[in-house]
């Protein structure tokens, strides 16, 4: 199955050496958002709404949005469908990363990952520590790559989603960010 990688606004593979990168338009990525919750609805899903608002305001495209119960198999099924879709570049989940019995997002997503992005969880918890102090140790936020698709698993709180997007994801999902970003790596994620 062919994977469609983002290109620059002129339809060519993204350049990492062009001095005019920041003058170019953002390369819009297709981002799917999954809210993991037994109780949220479209009307009450503030964290999912925040992520959609932030990603579209930045210039990215919403590929799909879903609210999925706290069930590892349902989470895994939706994530697997998106991972298999070459038009979905990024998956962001919100919810289910805590320590309670129903929190199973890491258990659902981890087996699907080809590689983990350890730095994401580490930096996210460091940023969260500045806001919520030692409560940040309860977060099991994680990120990784599966079939060339980036997956970011965030806590369910709106504040955590805001921190993750504003402080990490917005820059790393912009190919103009230097010295490096995750988008530049996308064409090489399938190398063997």
Language-model region placement:
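Non-catalytic beta/alpha edge segments that cap or flank active sites
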Residues: 2-192
